[in-house]
Design a protein with these regions (language model features):
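Secreted/periplasmic proteins
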Residues: 2-12, 18-137
Length: 137
């Protein structure tokens, strides 16, 4: 069997072209605030004493609504918050700013906290995932 250097060079060039000009297989993480964006940290929930107080979006806090506070996500963003300890999750709308305690990523309304079964603990580890970005009005 005779070695053909032209065929070898052509095959190597073809393979190198595939590697260089084919998009990578690694997926890019969703951008901040976009569908699929996730954060891991701790969640806490609002006290009943805050009932009726104005939130950062101008609305009044109502413990029965499934709302939440996040430091930077736009108001109106819908997120799914999951408690990995028990597997329970809840969908909430961002309506306020906070929490401003290190390690905490989201403050939940009482109704949302109840859904995650976190009322007794007060603060629990969670994963938060954007399921619907805020509308740009």
């Amino acid at each position: 069997m005779r070695f053909n250097s032209f065929a070898f060079t052509l095959a190597v060039t073809f393979c190198l072209g595939l590697v260089l000009f084919t998009p990578g297989c690694a997926s890019k993480a969703p951008a901040f605030g976009q569908k699929g964006y996730t954060e891991n940290g701790k969640a806490s929930y609002y006290s009943d004493k805050l009932r009726g107080n104005k939130m950062a979006n101008g609305q009044r806090y109502r413990p029965g609504k499934r709302t939440a506070a996040h430091k930077k996500l736009p108001f109106g963003t819908k997120v799914k918050v999951t408690n990995p300890v028990n597997g329970k999750s809840v969908k909430v709308r961002i309506t306020d700013r906070g929490p401003f305690v290190a390690g905490r990523i989201i403050d939940l309304s009482k109704s949302a906290a109840r859904k995650l079964d976190m009322q007794r603990a007060g603060v629990v580890p969670v994963q938060m995932k954007v399921i619907k970005p805020a509308k740009n009005d």
